[in-house]
Amino acid sequence: MSNMKIEKFNIRVYGLLFNRNNEVLVVDEEEYGLRFTKFPGGGLEFGEGLHDGLKREWMEELQTEVDIVRHLYTTDFFQASAFNPGHQLISIYYEVKLIRPIEATIHIHPFSFSDTTTEKLCFRWAQVSDSLLQQLTFPIDKLVAEQFVDTIKNDI
């Protein structure tokens, strides 16, 4: 455990969507002056269950509905938030499948933000390979990719 004073838990829920081309959907974002790449998802709201929170995040960000396929990972070590050092992250990852097609634009190049929106995020498919680990920014995402991407890739 860290020596810093932890004031709050920050519960995050993420969905990994794979396609037939051995790719996983990732999101590139810019916030607080930082650029980062992660799996789609976000923070749980008070009074919300994990599955409902994940489905809400996908609807908000990608304008699509998903079903939960299976639980992949829950953080089992201390991780401070990159944006709020006094917050301890608890991250839960699921494999998801689409109920209907994604309406949001899927980009080809990283950080291809639209000039017409204030929110800087864009989605793209990333090849399920060792290079995925270099593309992901946050330690828990890298751990999930390392532990589960090869297994899921073989199931596709």
Predicted regions mapped to residue ranges:
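Conserved N-terminal beta-strand and adjoining loop/helix that marks the start
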Residues: 2-24, 43, 95
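A generic structural micro-feature
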Residues: 5-9, 36, 84-90, 115-120
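Short, charged/polar surface micro-motifs in flexible loops or helix N-caps
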Residues: 18-23, 32-33, 45-46, 74-79, ...
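Conserved Nudix-box catalytic region and its N-terminal flanking loop in Nudix hydrolases
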Residues: 23-60
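A short coil-to-beta-strand element that immediately follows conserved catalytic motifs
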Residues: 65-74
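Active-site-adjacent beta-strand/loop module that shapes the phosphate/pyrophosphate-binding cleft
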Residues: 79-108, 147
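NUDIX/MutT-family hydrolases
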Residues: 106-142
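Charged phosphate-binding loop/patch that engages nucleotide di/tri-phosphates or the phosphate backbone
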Residues: 134-156
